[in-house]
From Swiss-Prot:
InterPro entries: DNA-binding_VF530-like, SAP_dom_sf. Keywords: DNA-binding. Signal peptide: none annotated. This is DNA-binding protein VF_0530. It comes from Aliivibrio fischeri (strain ATCC 700601 / ES114) (Vibrio fischeri). Monomer. Pfam families: VF530. One of its GO terms (molecular function) is double-stranded DNA binding.
Amino acid sequence: MALIMTQQNNPLHGITLQKLLTELVEHYGWEELSYMVNINCFKKDPSIKSSLKFLRKTDWARERVENIYLKLQRHKERNQ
């Protein structure tokens, strides 16, 4: 029961890392993302595939990207 309640309050529940990253790239672009999160997979020959591979292995980087996504979603909600 606690897990269900936790997931209901999780704004990222049901959103894949690929969807999240794709939306960020469409909104900010790779160059801007590389300034926001200083990782090579955003700087040198960036691709969704290589970035997903890195983010799935690297918790701190994934958390930063998820936080950027959440801020973007809050900004979109305020402007509607």
